[in-house]
């Protein structure tokens, strides 16, 4: 870790680290560990309007210089006074990032560290096999005393064999580092909830402990509470079982350890899934036999219909959901879409959220990491905003709706179906269960899950039908891409199949029961190398509208449909996804592409207040102080979710740095020559309107660590962080040691 004992020097502008030296900006200005950074910022003021003067060709507005705009396509149009290099050198200093790497493993066909000629290549793309160090106290405190008064420990199940500390005073003196002085030394969790779930391990414990003297003269250390701040439904300070110590105030969908243990030992029965899967195997064999016969399609369909057997189970009536222009959607984001980040976005106006994608098989195996992804904050289990202007389902009850849904993926129908039954049984606060059919990363794709399902429409349909049958009242949705390959787009046929069912079986099977489809306007092959294709999304939106109308006619001409297989009264919602970076993008897509709503992904990580802009219908030029306040909130929300002890605090630090790896890419609109901003435009080297704004734009990850230290205290000596997606600047830093 770099020393902070350095002389004060001006912060270099964004990009200068690559052009001049590799010394981080925060090494050139001393930052204290105070809750508010010592960098002073001038209050935000309206920009003075210059008096009209004769303009030279170079001074004309960019709208009048289309040729210049074309020459600089892909480069953020930053005003000349903020550039630190001549305009002719702008393209050379523009930051290059790899958002494909941020999603997971390598892109299709990526080679290893050595090229075809055997020579070692320069590192680029994703940092694979990243390590973050080990975060632990010097001496471990036993759970039997971690939340109890000094003289009233609980029984230690390890007895004399326990190698953890049982002496609280010794632990506080020798077993951990001293209390932190950020936030004035007061525990953010205790200040919010009136108690701290980290107990004696909290790195702010001195703010919520006291020493009491008994009549016999003995002095005892006890933890304190503030009853006025404790909510009735909050978890107890002392967990009834030490394994449930991860229960946090304001966090829902926490599955009991006993359930996860039973899953890992295969002691949980999936009665509905087992019945349905047994029927599905017979039906699939029947379909296979008929479709291999040398007959016309009509004859095959008739033969299949004649021998078709109804499934043993029917779907339960689903809770109605709603998507509209007033319900912007936060995408399920790997790594970035954690609970503290979703909480921040909901606070700023996100109306619908999803968990990070979980793998179905680890869920069925009871793995803690995947079940942790299923947790929701209390703000996510409230109803979404509902101010409809068009025709909506009259049976929709907004008071029963909620914001939070979970996303899973699977490579086999039995995994998807059993996962849906398990999630619906043990998670009481679910809006939907979303099946990811678009994840492009190699590990998922090569297993047959994610975007591999785009080329297996029959298997995908069986998954949706089965999940819908066993998920109780929870609707099932799907997220797809345009296709796997650029020259073979499959989304239109797939959307029809999800809306109506396969043409040859829909007469007997009805609709699969998919409540909504989200289409990402890219192929797997394309990834983020090109802009999202909203014209194709618009074509699919028009098809969905016709399919919804067609579903009504099919009900009239074939047979009376089972209401339980028709979520939302027979209407399938359609959501578009890709490159939404402002309210202008959002409403343009809703009004012109005719989607029900828009899902926001990277745009929300770069500027979470995009949801605030959508609600306000205008651009918001956030000051550096306001943006730093979002970083502070993330830190507080992280400690509430993961704990204020050594482990939880550095878990928060790790995900805060992941957040900053996108957050720093925001270019304030006050610095741009023209609007709207484009998310894929790369910013050249520039300086902000003040030192703090310049610091927040730094692409040096060492600066991000220093920013985290403003709110989380000094990083441990063994803490490590490497950005998930590298840029040229990161390579230079590593090359220069």
UniProtKB/Swiss-Prot annotation:
Keywords: Cytoplasm, Flavoprotein, FMN, Metal-binding, mRNA processing, NAD, NADP, Nucleus, Oxidoreductase, Repeat, tRNA processing, Zinc, Zinc-finger. GO terms for biological process: mRNA processing. Pfam families: Dus. Catalyzes the synthesis of dihydrouridine, a modified base found in the D-loop of most tRNAs. Specifically modifies U47 in cytoplasmic tRNAs. Catalyzes the synthesis of dihydrouridine in some mRNAs, thereby affecting their translation. Belongs to the Dus family. Dus3 subfamily. It catalyses: 5,6-dihydrouridine(47) in tRNA + NAD(+) = uridine(47) in tRNA + NADH + H(+); 5,6-dihydrouridine(47) in tRNA + NADP(+) = uridine(47) in tRNA + NADPH + H(+); a 5,6-dihydrouridine in mRNA + NAD(+) = a uridine in mRNA + NADH + H(+); a 5,6-dihydrouridine in mRNA + NADP(+) = a uridine in mRNA + NADPH + H(+). Its EC number is 1.3.1.89, 1.3.1.-. The keyword Repeat applies. Residues 1-11, 24-33, 57-82 have a biased composition (Basic and acidic residues). The keyword tRNA processing applies. It is found in: Cytoplasm; Nucleus. Its cofactor is FMN. GO terms for cellular component: cytoplasm; nuclear periphery. The active site is at residue 439. Disulfide bonds: none annotated. Residues 1-127 are annotated as: Disordered. A zinc finger (C3H1-type) spans 142-166, 187-208. The lineage of its organism: Eukaryota, Fungi, Dikarya, Ascomycota, Pezizomycotina. GO terms for molecular function: flavin adenine dinucleotide binding; mRNA dihydrouridine synthase activity; tRNA dihydrouridine synthase activity; tRNA-dihydrouridine47 synthase activity; zinc ion binding. This is tRNA-dihydrouridine(47) synthase [NAD(P)(+)]. FMN binds at residues 332-334, 407, 479, 520, 577-579, 601-602. InterPro entries: Aldolase_TIM (IPR013785), DUS-like_FMN-bd (IPR035587), tRNA_hU_synthase_CS (IPR018517). Residues 35-44 have a biased composition (Low complexity).
């Amino acid at each position: 870790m770099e020393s902070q004992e350095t002389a004060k020097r001006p912060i270099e502008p964004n990009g200068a680290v690559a052009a001049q030296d590799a010394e981080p900006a925060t090494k050139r200005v001393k930052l204290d560990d105070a809750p508010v950074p010592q960098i002073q910022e001038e209050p935000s003021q309206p920009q003075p309007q210059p008096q009209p003067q004769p303009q030279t060709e170079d001074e004309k507005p960019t709208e009048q210089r289309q040729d210049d705009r074309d020459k600089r396509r892909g480069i953020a149009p930053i005003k000349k006074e903020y550039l630190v290099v001549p305009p002719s050198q702008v393209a050379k200093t523009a930051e290059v990032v790899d958002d494909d790497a941020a999603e997971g493993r390598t892109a299709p066909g990526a080679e290893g560290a050595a090229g075809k000629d055997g020579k070692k290549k320069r590192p680029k793309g994703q940092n694979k096999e990243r390590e973050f160090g080990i975060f632990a106290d010097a001496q471990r405190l036993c759970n039997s005393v971690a939340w109890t008064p000094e003289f009233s420990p609980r029984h230690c199940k390890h007895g004399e064999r326990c190698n953890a500390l049982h002496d609280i005073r010794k632990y506080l003196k020798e077993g951990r580092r001293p209390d932190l002085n950020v936030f004035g030394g007061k525990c953010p969790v205790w200040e919010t909830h009136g108690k701290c779930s980290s107990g004696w391990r909290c790195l702010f414990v001195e703010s919520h402990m006291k020493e009491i003297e008994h009549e016999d003269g003995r002095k005892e250390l006890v933890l304190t509470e503030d009853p006025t701040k404790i909510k009735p439904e909050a978890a107890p300070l002392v967990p009834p079982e030490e394994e449930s110590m991860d229960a946090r105030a304001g966090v829902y969908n926490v599955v009991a350890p006993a359930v996860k243990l039973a899953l890992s030992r295969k002691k949980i029965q999936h009665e509905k899934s087992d019945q349905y899967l047994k029927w599905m195997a017979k039906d699939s064999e029947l379909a296979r036999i008929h479709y291999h016969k040398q007959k016309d399609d009509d004859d095959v369909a008739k033969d299949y219909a004649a021998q078709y057997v109804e499934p043993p189970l029917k779907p339960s009536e689903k809770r109605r959901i709603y998507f509209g222009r007033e319900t912007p959607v936060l995408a399920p984001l790997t790594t970035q879409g954690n609970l503290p980040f979703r909480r921040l976005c909901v606070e700023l106006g996100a109306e619908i959220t999803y968990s990070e994608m979980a793998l179905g098989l680890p869920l069925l195996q009871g793995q803690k990491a995947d079940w942790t992804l299923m947790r929701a904050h209390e703000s996510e289990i409230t109803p979404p905003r509902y101010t409809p202007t068009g025709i909506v389902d009259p049976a929709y009850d907004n008071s029963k709706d909620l914001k939070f849904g979970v996303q899973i993926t699977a490579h086999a129908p039995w995994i998807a179906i059993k996962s849906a039954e398990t999630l619906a049984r043990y998670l009481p606060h679910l809006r939907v269960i979303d099946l990811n059919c678009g994840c492009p990363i190699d590990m998922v794709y090569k297993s047959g899950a994610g975007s591999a399902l785009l080329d297996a429409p029959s298997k995908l349909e069986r998954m949706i039908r089965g999940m819908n049958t066993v998920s109780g009242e929870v609707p099932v949705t799907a997220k797809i891409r345009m296709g796997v390959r650029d020259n073979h787009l499959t989304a239109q046929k797939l959307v029809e199949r999800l809306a109506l069912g396969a043409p040859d079986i829909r007469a007997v099977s009805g609709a699969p029961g998919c409540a909504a489809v989200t289409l990402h306007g890219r192929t797997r092959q394309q990834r983020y190398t090109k802009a999202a294709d909203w014209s194709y999304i618009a074509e699919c939106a028009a098809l969905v509208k016709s399919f919804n109308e067609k579903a009504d006619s099919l009900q009239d001409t074939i047979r009376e449909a089972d209401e339980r297989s028709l979520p939302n009264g027979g209407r399938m919602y359609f959501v578009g996804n890709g490159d939404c970076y402002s309210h202008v993008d959002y409403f343009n897509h809703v009004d012109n592409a005719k989607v029900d709503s828009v899902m926001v992904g990277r745009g929300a990580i770069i500027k979470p207040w995009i949801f605030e802009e959508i609600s306000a219908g205008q651009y918001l030029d956030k000051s550096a102080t306001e943006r730093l306040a979002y970083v502070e909130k993330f830190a507080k929300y992280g400690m509430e979710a993961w704990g204020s002890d050594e482990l939880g605090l550095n878990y928060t630090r790790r995900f805060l740095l992941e957040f900053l790896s996108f957050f720093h890419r925001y270019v304030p609109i006050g610095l741009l020559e023209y609007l709207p901003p484009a998310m894929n435009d790369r910013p050249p080297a520039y300086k902000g309107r003040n030192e703090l704004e310049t610091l927040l734009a730094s692409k040096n990850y060492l600066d991000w660590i220093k920013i985290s230290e403003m709110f989380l205290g000094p990083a441990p000596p063994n803490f490590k962080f490497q950005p998930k997606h590298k840029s040229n600047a990161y390579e230079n830093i590593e090359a220069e040691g």
